[in-house]
Amino acid sequence: MGGYILAIDQGTTSTRAIVFDGKQQVAGVGQKEFKQYFPKSGWVEHDPEEIWETVLFTARQAIEKAGISATDIAAIGITNQRETVVVWDRATGKPIHNAIVWQDRRTASFCDKLKKQGLEKTFSKKTGLLLDPYFSGTKLNWLLTNVKGAPARAAKGELCFGTVDTFLIWRLTGGKSFVTDATNASRTLIYNIVDNSWDDELTDILRIPRVMLPEVKDCAADFGVTDASLFGAAIPILGVAGDQQAATIGQACFKPGMLKSTYGTGCFALLNTGKDIVRSKNRLLTTIAYRLNGETTYALEGSIFVAGAAVQWLRDGLKVIKAAPDTGTLAESADPTQDVYLVPAFTGLGAPHWDPDARGAIYGMTRNTGPAEFARAALESVCYQTRDLLDAMHRDWRSNGKDTVLRVDGGMVASDWTMQRLSDLLDAPVDRPVILETTALGVAWLAGSRAGVWPKQEEFAKSWARDRRFEPKMDGTTRKGKLKGWRSAVKRTLMAA
């Protein structure tokens, strides 16, 4: 057995598998996209079988590209899109319905009904979350309500519920392990983050039988061993974390006050609050950053539904760019005298507004507005939303923000223009790491440290390396004016919802 770690990064639009060597360097990568299903407006689904196929394909591809065999791999780490719900037959392992994705809004009216019953405070106090369709609990309730025979089968213990990690572990271990980790559990709306356990009151409200829920483990733990037939040898699964928590670990944000922001399909900012459960007064989420050796570290999280998705809209919807990397160059050529604002509420607005009914809008267009201005507005919308999140975090964390340094990762951070504009609008330094695969790196560290082949936490944190720091260059008057325009645009969008 070698010091290699296989990290499986199961995302919203594609699955990536990365083999890291003993020096925490990328040795091999596999990636495969899969189909998105939109049965109705606001509904988003995945086929769990297609996800499973991409996991096998990319893992084998990464191992092959690394030039190693399964016997060289010390452990597997799994990180995944959070909140997405899978329900499958315990006997056959077959899903009873497509996975309902975190972006799916079909349970909005049910969430409103629960709010009118005065239950949001109950959920928030126990889970740190808001009553929103984003989270797993109401999605699971929908499946149990709408799939014929599901309630009775679930009550008999015939059905299993899991976030994507749980489903993959079940499949990888041949149905021998029915487990999840604390970070994924904390996103379900039925896990008590104070007691660190499934909550009977919440499962009763949502009519979810406890028997269908997985065992919850630390992020670095024994999650089972893969079936030897899958990769040519049995490999222990020793690390699991939701994608944003894994990125927090990969960015070595281990100290209270450190924060990172990941820019993928959406944008997710996490602020480490240590052992303190900080209750947000600004509609941020209180969540579990990670749990190691039985000790829970908490975080404040701000979730933005549309980040990279805005660039995809430019490419696939407006067709003003041919490829995502073109966006920064196009934005740079925009007319500086035009103040065009895109509020990308394609599926509602996330933190700190949490309005599922808001819809996208563009303000400030003139006859001279063209592709360059649209590109700039799309990229700036991500920066503005990040500013909103960080302002809310500073208020909750009682920080003046002067010492803020934001560590960034995800596909969008490769754009120098976007990162410079982010620093300008935040009025804070933005650090881009050498290794951009921070989500995979974080879960690889969980697995590698558990296996004893990767360094301990303190040494791992010291090894974090910066590629470039972006410092604010925009003058205060310009920044103030742009932020005022953005807030006006958001206000008008919310009023129209």
Swiss-Prot record:
An annotated Gene Ontology molecular function: glycerol kinase activity
Catalytic activity: glycerol + ATP = sn-glycerol 3-phosphate + ADP + H(+)
Sequence positions that bind ATP: 12-14, 265, 308, 312, 411
Enzyme Commission number(s): 2.7.1.30
Kinase keyword on record: yes
Record has Acetylation as a keyword: no
Pathway: Polyol metabolism; glycerol degradation via glycerol kinase pathway; sn-glycerol 3-phosphate from glycerol: step 1/1
Gene3D superfamilies, sorted: 3.30.420.40
EC class of the enzyme, as a word: transferase
Entry keyword set: ATP-binding, Glycerol metabolism, Kinase, Nucleotide-binding, Transferase
Binding-site residues, ADP: 12, 16, 265, 308, 411
UniProt binding sites for glycerol: 82-83, 134, 243-244
GO CC annotations, alphabetized: cytosol
InterPro entries (alphabetical): ATPase_NBD (IPR043129), Carb_kinase_FGGY (IPR000577), Carb_kinase_FGGY_CS (IPR018483), FGGY_C (IPR018485), FGGY_N (IPR018484), Glycerol_kin (IPR005999)
UniProt xrefs under SUPFAM superfamilies: Actin-like ATPase domain (SSF53067)
GO BP terms, alphabetized: glycerol catabolic process; glycerol metabolic process; glycerol-3-phosphate metabolic process
Top-level division of the source organism's lineage: Bacteria
Amino acids binding sn-glycerol 3-phosphate: 12, 82-83, 134, 243
Activity regulation field: Inhibited by fructose 1,6-bisphosphate (FBP).
Function: Key enzyme in the regulation of glycerol uptake and metabolism. Catalyzes the phosphorylation of glycerol to yield sn-glycerol 3-phosphate.
Family: Belongs to the FGGY kinase family.
PANTHER family reported for this sequence: GLYCEROL KINASE, SUGAR KINASE
Name used for this protein in its record: Glycerol kinase
Organism: Sinorhizobium fredii (strain NBRC 101917 / NGR234)
Lineage: Bacteria, Pseudomonadati, Pseudomonadota, Alphaproteobacteria, Hyphomicrobiales
Gene this chain is encoded by: glpK
